[in-house]
Amino acid sequence: MKERNISIKSKVEIQELFKKGRFIRIEGINVFYEFTCLAISRILVTFPRIFKGAVKRNRVRRIFKECFRKQFALLKDRYVDFIFVVYPQKADVNYHEVETILKNIVVYIMKRNM
């Protein structure tokens, strides 16, 4: 069975999330999030135009998506759409840093929305 796609791809959904979503800034990363009625949490990793180098952008994107995929259990049956805007100072981020950042974000969101 094919795993569901965890990416947000619709331009309308992305614009709506930027407008209506809640906002957190953590360590050079802006996070927009909104609870959703879908049966899956989704993610979009994007970068400002000043972030040059496709190889670095794609590496950061892969790391974020993999960490997010492994952190599904922390959301405890709550489904959230996330947009991560990653700035150039986080270009050399490693897997364990991203894992820690995502755990902190999920814990913060769950505390805030209990």
Swiss-Prot record:
One of its GO terms (biological process) is tRNA 5'-leader removal. SUPFAM superfamilies: Ribosomal protein S5 domain 2-like. The keyword RNA-binding applies. GO terms for molecular function: ribonuclease P activity; tRNA binding. Gene3D superfamilies: 3.30.230.10. It catalyses: Endonucleolytic cleavage of RNA, removing 5'-extranucleotides from tRNA precursor. InterPro entries: Ribosomal_Su5_D2-typ_SF (IPR020568), Ribsml_uS5_D2-typ_fold_subgr (IPR014721), RNase_P (IPR000100). Keywords: Endonuclease, Hydrolase, Nuclease, RNA-binding, tRNA processing. It comes from the Bacteria. Its EC number is 3.1.26.5. Signal peptide: none annotated. It is an enzyme of class 3 (hydrolase). Consists of a catalytic RNA component (M1 or rnpB) and a protein subunit. RNaseP catalyzes the removal of the 5'-leader sequence from pre-tRNA to produce the mature 5'-terminus. It can also cleave other RNA substrates such as 4.5S RNA. The protein component plays an auxiliary but essential role in vivo by binding to the 5'-leader sequence and broadening the substrate specificity of the ribozyme. Belongs to the RnpA family. This is Ribonuclease P protein component. The lineage of its organism: Bacteria, Pseudomonadati, Spirochaetota, Spirochaetia, Spirochaetales. The gene is rnpA.
